[in-house]
Regions:
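Terminal accessory/targeting
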Residues: 1-68, 72-76, 93-102, 207, ...
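Membrane-targeting and insertion segments and their boundary/processing signals
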Residues: 5-8, 12-15, 121, 125, ...
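Active-site beta->alpha N-cap acidic-glycine motif
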Residues: 53-165, 276
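Structural detector of well-ordered beta-strand residues that form the stable sheet scaffold
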Residues: 103-105, 129, 170, 204, ...
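Catalytic domains of cell-wall/extracellular-matrix polysaccharide-remodeling enzymes
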Residues: 135-240, 244-260, 266, 273, ...
Length: 283
């Protein structure tokens, strides 16, 4: 009887272990399924955020309605903020492959690699715009002088490196950023735009947003969809994207963005001081 009991116990133990293993396998499969579903929900939520953000930006733009006039030239201005980085180099490679031009609103970096990228941007027919030397909001938006000093410092670096003196810029966060009011007072944004124009420069916001800065890493399809939907029905699309070090999916999205914009009839140009700007309503 002792051996029989041991055998029965062993069978029961094996049965329990098999049951546990089966349960764990099912549990793991459920966890994986929930994880995948959660990722899909995040992407769907981001897409909804894209719609909301595009609507907000549309409301902020001055004279922003898409043109309904047929058969007019359509120009796309791809713009990349917050570089240079290794992503900038990959973006330049893609632009070269597609024979497309872009504008890079750069920040200050005096490494040899960054200087190489400043030079390459200009040498390959693209444009450089100023985006402040430091991109530290609490510093650059303290006052009109602090903002302009950051721009001058960056302008001198770019000019010394490339021989080209930039005359266009983009406010970090856009011209309607609330950080101007938070750090510099209610009148700072207005005084800055007037100062920029007095000095013979132009600033550019955007009317199409790739949404690649809405969270640390936005999926490639969401970026592509945001740009192509935002550009639909326009004759001029100033597209906001980013080439900061973390923006790997922006690089991945770029070929589909270029192909999609070409399919909509766009040709690619660089921003210049006399390009029709997109301006947000000031805070």
């Amino acid at each position: 009887m002792g051996k029989q009991k041991k055998f029965i116990v062993a069978v029961l133990v094996v049965g329990v272990l098999v049951g546990l293993a089966t349960h764990m396998f099912k549990l793991q499969a459920t966890v994986q399924a929930l994880k995948k579903e959660n990722e899909q929900l995040i992407d769907e939520n981001t897409s909804l955020s894209v719609d909301l953000e595009m609507a907000k930006q549309e409301a902020q733009l001055i004279d922003s309605k898409p043109s309904t006039q047929p058969k007019q030239p359509k120009f796309a201005y791809l713009t990349f903020d917050d570089g240079p980085s290794s992503n900038t180099e990959q973006i330049l490679n893609i632009l070269k492959e597609y024979d497309a031009k872009a504008t890079f609103f750069v920040i200050g970096s005096e490494t040899e690699y960054s200087k190489h990228l400043y030079k390459r941007i200009i040498e390959e027919g693209h444009a450089i715009g100023l985006h402040s030397y430091s991109h530290v909001y609490s510093d650059i938006y303290k006052s009109e002088d602090a903002f302009m000093e950051s721009m001058y410092q960056l302008r001198n670096l770019v000019e010394d490196t490339t021989g080209v003196r930039p005359d266009i810029l983009r406010f970090p966060g856009g011209s309607n950023t609330t950080f101007t009011t938070r750090y510099g007072g209610a009148e700072l944004a207005s005084s800055l735009t007037k100062r920029i124009h007095r000095e013979g420069m132009q600033y550019f916001d955007w009317n199409v947003c790739g949404q690649d800065a809405t969270r640390p890493l936005v999926s490639t399809p969401v970026i592509v969809d945001a740009v192509l939907r935002g550009a639909r029905g326009r004759n001029q699309a100033i597209v906001l994207l980013h080439d900061a070090p973390a923006k790997k999916t922006t690089v991945e999205a770029l070929p589909a963005i270029i192909e999609g914009l070409k399919a909509q009839g766009y040709t690619f140009e660089v921003l210049k001081r006399d390009t029709q700007p997109a301006h947000f309503r000031l805070p």
